Amino acid sequence: MTQALTPTVSNTAQPDPARLLAPIVRQVGQAIGDYRMIEQGDRVMVCLSGGKDSYTLLDVLLHLQKKAPIDFEVVAVNLDQGQPGFPKDVLPRYLTALGVRHDILTEDTYSVVKEKTPEGKTTCSLCSRLRRGILYQHAREIGATKIALGHHREDILETLFMNMFFGARLKAMPPKLQSDDGTNVVIRPLAYVAEADIIRYAQAREFPVIPCNLCGAQPNLQRKVVGDMLEGWEREHPGRLNNILRSLTRVTPSHLLDRELYDFASLSVTPAQGDTGFDAESFPEREFMAGLSELSLLQ
């Protein structure tokens, strides 16, 4: 979810963008290594929306391009969707000054979305579907081997809870996947990065952020509600969002209810393994005590 940047007024010196970028680069490098997102000779198409996340992603990949032990290309691509008032000169000017290869595509999907979306319904699903199709096609045309999107930690967790709350499915947003058309590999290098870190970096870099007239004009989006919930959790219990994210990497199918993931029907007693079904859960002491305090179970 692209959050608007709120200018801050301070008497202190402006933060050094390089210092703010360093931890983001480390986390992105970790994610790339963990999921083998970028390999030798890749041509990475970075989808640049004009929001803080994709600007940050482009900066990080350009930085890694100079430092990484492998060679890969970066191509920035923006899709002008015909939104009224869209500043057509901002991104070409910015990308030219940056010296990065870039393509600006023009397709009036805005009119299609406004025409096809019933009153009171959100435009996100149709808009993203149309946008994906155009970007996938362009990736094939330029020979891109990877398509990089700017989704960060909060985007992944919002999707997890959206699917749980409204779709009754345990499903998040993968860091790497095969695209809908089966011909592209999509990667999310910012998967480990907190949105707050991106906001601080984007403010320090003073990116020319372009708001989305479709997304930003829709009140009461369920994703916004879920995002506020996560923000509240992290504010009251720092580290909780990282723990939730880590839990997605440490799944125990035998302790869930999905019969497709675990063969409960064929389960039999295996004395050598023992029965841990009724054993106490094992948590790190700090998290365990904090959880007990929160649940008022220390009585």
UniProtKB/Swiss-Prot annotation:
It catalyses: cytidine(32) in tRNA + S-sulfanyl-L-cysteinyl-[cysteine desulfurase] + AH2 + ATP = 2-thiocytidine(32) in tRNA + L-cysteinyl-[cysteine desulfurase] + A + AMP + diphosphate + H(+). It is an enzyme of class 2 (transferase). CDD domains: TtcA-like (cd24138). It comes from the Bacteria. Its cofactor is Mg(2+); [4Fe-4S] cluster. Gene3D superfamilies: HUPs. GO terms for biological process: tRNA thio-modification. Pfam families: ATP_bind_3 (PF01171). It is found in: Cytoplasm. Keywords: 4Fe-4S, ATP-binding, Cytoplasm, Iron, Iron-sulfur, Magnesium, Metal-binding, Nucleotide-binding, RNA-binding, Transferase, tRNA processing, tRNA-binding. Coiled coil: none annotated. Its EC number is 2.8.1.-. GO terms for cellular component: cytosol. A motif (PP-loop motif) lies at residues 49-54. Pathway: tRNA modification. Binds 1 [4Fe-4S] cluster per subunit. The cluster is chelated by three Cys residues, the fourth Fe has a free coordination site that may bind a sulfur atom transferred from the persulfide of IscS. One of its GO terms (molecular function) is sulfurtransferase activity. SUPFAM superfamilies: Adenine nucleotide alpha hydrolases-like (SSF52402). Homodimer. Belongs to the TtcA family. Catalyzes the ATP-dependent 2-thiolation of cytidine in position 32 of tRNA, to form 2-thiocytidine (s(2)C32). The sulfur atoms are provided by the cysteine/cysteine desulfurase (IscS) system. The thiolation reaction likely consists of two steps: a first activation step by ATP to form an adenylated intermediate of the target base of tRNA, and a second nucleophilic substitution step of the sulfur (S) atom supplied by the hydrosulfide attached to the Fe-S cluster. HAMAP family: TtcA (MF_01850). This is tRNA-cytidine(32) 2-sulfurtransferase. It comes from Deinococcus radiodurans (strain ATCC 13939 / DSM 20539 / JCM 16871 / CCUG 27074 / LMG 4051 / NBRC 15346 / NCIMB 9279 / VKM B-1422 / R1). The gene is ttcA.
